[in-house]
Amino acid sequence: MPGRLNAYRDVAPPGRVDLLQQLSKQVRGQRMLHVNASRAVGGVAEILQHLIPLLSELGIQARWEVMEGTESFYEATELFHLGLQGLDVMVSEALVDGYLECCRTNARSLDLSADVVMTHDVPPLALVDEAATDARWLWQCHLDLSHPQRKIWSLLRPYVTKYDAAVFSLPQFAQPLALPQFLIYPSLDPLSDKNRELAPEELDQILEKLQIPRDKPILLEVSGFNKFTDPLGVLAAYRRVKTHNDCRLVLAGSMPTDGPASQRVLEEVRDAAAKDEDIHLVLL
């Protein structure tokens, strides 16, 4: 069976690709729809960019729909994400109403016809209210839901319970729910550019383009700009290291697109790094 799947034979456990091909015969021809809030930014988008072609190669009719959001929608979902991961946030009734209205609007504009619909994280969560009775709806939560803020979880839990099943990244990230729960452990595509070896000349070209000198050791942090990746904590760790070993810090991450809270974190990082020429902020 030619195709991209065969490229994984060198990195997957022996027999795993053959097993996937055998198992796929049971669901071949099934229509599977994934729904999230971005086609280009974030971990979910990265997963789906690689997953959709593999599902299609296995004979599953895989599609990917992306929600269209308003400013209030993205502000609400950002606060929901922060609250679900334990931060104390306040979400106004107007933001909640804006989120739900945006979900209703997307339910009318998106093609939700499928045998299985998998929504990712909070943005498409409330789409389940428009679920077709002949489809199975799964909610995949990529967040740590172990200690959610009670008010936020109480608000969103009724939508989660309408799903046929939920998917979490680790057992300790899940919540007690009266529906089947499954685990899909976090992973990176071993064949993606993130795992590709860079030749020394490529490294030199990249550092030269970014105007980062190679006169001292480099510490590298690649992550988003939010409270949970804690870039200010990374700066503090770098400064502790620097008292013993002179070095540079490269703090690389994508431009925040999920709401004002992440924008504020980025501004705090800029302010904290402004007077240190050995800190290099790279926005991808």
Give residue spans per PLM region.
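Donor nucleotide-sugar binding/catalytic pocket of nucleotide-sugar-dependent glycosyltransferases
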Residues: 146, 157-215
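Short donor-sugar binding/catalytic loops of nucleotide-sugar-dependent glycosyltransferases
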Residues: 38, 213, 222-226, 241, ...
